[in-house]
Amino acid sequence: MYTEINEMLTPKVLKVQAESPYKARIVLEPLERGFGHTLGNALRRILLSSMPGSAITEASIDGVLHEYSTIEGVQEDVVDLLLNLKSVAIKLTVGNEAQITLNKEGPCQVTAGDIQLTHGQEIINPELVIANLNEKGKLNMTLKVERGIGFHNTDAFVRYHDDEIEKKTVGKLKIDNSFSPVKKVAYFVDSARVENRTDLDKLTIELETNGTIDAEEAIRISASILQRQLHAFVDMKFEESRADNKERNDFDPVLLRSVDDLELTVRSANCLKAENIHYIGDLVQRTESELLKTPNLGKKSLTEIKDVLASRSLSLGMKLENWPPASLGE
């Protein structure tokens, strides 16, 4: 079985064609037929839904109690402000949570670059427009940035954190957001050829990130996530082996050894093998009378066997429960 698995083709060529720092095309070939879609679909789903990243998840705005408010002198209403904050590509390099602020007075255009950062944050798209202020406009915000995986759903937060809802301070606006740094993913499967084989796959993955990580790093992380999730299946044989070892440990290790290790005379050894006695554990369960019924095994051979067993603190006629172990001979 393992020989057949080892004979399967594994990819020999991995090409990364960068169209920009955050957009790339990754080509993997050759793959056995069908593996292009198997791997492509799995990686695409992970890239879109399960990648770790950072996002703004909460905003406190001076003078605003809920998201259906408006702010004097600000062109955008609060809902639009929150939507714009969702588009801020921010990278946390230290810790899993941080607070940042934004304080601006009009007339001006407020961009992501106006956000005042503390230690360990980086904004990738500082040109992103958040709001437009006129002469009377004033915008003071405190923003919460968190690291996470996949999509941050405020409805789920409310549903599963009822005890915290009571503690929630009025004016803290929760923001639905995606932590995933991947914006777009698509994969294509084409035919590939190796020598005379033409039934192989070539997998091409096109992806674009928000800039907090590059495309090559994104594909590497997604492959690592898939590998970790499949590790339990790979380890099944190891767990089975540990169970076998436990079973074997119930017996004296000497009993699991071959009768050849007793170094009997050729005559005695051949007689035992003719009776399908291959392990010392098989031998010690036989009685003297049973062995004497063995063709060509006389009293001299019997005495030899008894003496050799006695030198190992063993004897004939022993009772061994659950013998033989299921894993014996593997």
Curated annotation (Swiss-Prot):
GO molecular function: DNA binding; DNA-directed RNA polymerase activity; protein dimerization activity
Classification via Gene3D superfamilies: 5' to 3' exonuclease, C-terminal subdomain, DNA-directed RNA polymerase, insert domain, RNA polymerase, RBP11-like subunit
EC number(s) per entry: 2.7.7.6
Pfam families recorded: RNA_pol_A_bac, RNA_pol_A_CTD, RNA_pol_L
SMART domains associated with the record: RPOLD
Keywords: DNA-directed RNA polymerase, Nucleotidyltransferase, Transcription, Transferase
InterPro entries: DNA-dir_RNA_pol_insert, DNA-dir_RNA_pol_RpoA/D/Rpb3, DNA-dir_RpoA, RBP11-like, RNAP_asu_C, RNApol_insert_sf
Region ranges (Alpha C-terminal domain (alpha-CTD)): 251-330
Record text about domains: The N-terminal domain is essential for RNAP assembly and basal transcription, whereas the C-terminal domain is involved in interaction with transcriptional regulators and with upstream promoter elements.
Main function: DNA-dependent RNA polymerase catalyzes the transcription of DNA into RNA using the four ribonucleoside triphosphates as substrates.
Name of the protein in question: DNA-directed RNA polymerase subunit alpha
Taxonomic source organism: Legionella pneumophila subsp. pneumophila (strain Philadelphia 1 / ATCC 33152 / DSM 7513)
